[in-house]
Amino acid sequence: MPDSRDLQLSSYDYVLPEDRIAQAPVEPRHDARLLVVPPAERSLSELRHQRVWDWQQELQPGDLLVVNDTRVLKARLRVRRSGGGLGELLVLEPRGEGRWLCLARPAKRMRPGDQLWLEALEQEPLSLAVLANDAASGGRIVQFPPDCVDALSLEGLLERYGEVPLPPYITRHDSSDQERYQTRYATRPGAVAAPTAGLHLSDALLAAIAERGVALAHVTLHVGLGTFRPVETEDLSDLTLHSEWVEVRAEVVEAVLACRARGGRVIAVGTTSVRALEAAAAGGGGLQPLKGPVDLVIQPGYRFQVVQGLLTNFHLPKSSLLLLVSALIGRDQLLQIYNAAIEEMYRFYSYGDAMWIAPEAVLFDARPE
């Protein structure tokens, strides 16, 4: 059972020096550092420091690696306002008939009834219209061409006019981010942020892992902006989270069952893969195919149904991702590990280093039964 501090948001705060926020990825992808968490009964003095390339040695023949194959849309649009001046939209989610929820900047100067123009080199200007304010998100409902009804149909427009939306704590602007802020297996468009643990997996590392007899399965969770936003309520006992669109296909369920049958371990790459798998098992009837919005909360006290191990990055203070990782290894332990990582000069957040939580490092009470 979690103690009272586990249900207080302020218990998930920590201080990160600004120079620990990674501004650029390492090359090659698998050369990022890897902090290996010791087994649950061991001391944190046994933390190990490796490279992500070495992670293949931590995996066993028969294991199943589950990755998130979402693709980041070029969802950042620079616009010219009808009244003059420039602005910016971040396209978030469809609202039907070509209408999309967007975050607008400057929001006060994009009001219902305003016309916006998309402009790009070698492209005809394209008109958009602000239809309404969205009170829940503080965003705007914007009319796009009526055939832009989902991520797949919108992607062509975004490819012509948009940019990959890097998180605000990354201040650099480099054309290489269009490729580097995608995983190597990103095939299903719909995210506005990358599933960042997967950014470490190079083609060479994936091939080496496969050669060890480790299977690979793909889930889809379209990462929304809310994933990286701080939680805003101090009392976490009735926490609710934004929903994100998830698909766990029948072949993934079959792969998990086959992994269990052969004595393998189910390893998630990233918190989004965890959320997808656990949501697909949340109905009480075991792991089932799933397609649709998910708002599952994973925090200390949660008993995992599917996931046994996790490769993950270092996350923002007071975020839902920090709660999820705390559910695996405990809040006190996690914050001690983060402090050790800061002292050891690990790089944090989207382009930063990684942490490996093996099945034996997971709290006994959190492990799948």
Curated annotation (Swiss-Prot):
Family: Belongs to the QueA family.
Entry's Gene Ontology molecular function annotations: S-adenosylmethionine:tRNA ribosyltransferase-isomerase activity
Catalytic activity: 7-aminomethyl-7-carbaguanosine(34) in tRNA + S-adenosyl-L-methionine = epoxyqueuosine(34) in tRNA + adenine + L-methionine + 2 H(+)
Keyword S-adenosyl-L-methionine: yes
Protein name: S-adenosylmethionine:tRNA ribosyltransferase-isomerase
Annotated localization: Cytoplasm
InterPro entries hit by this protein: QueA, QueA_dom1, QueA_dom2, QueA_sf
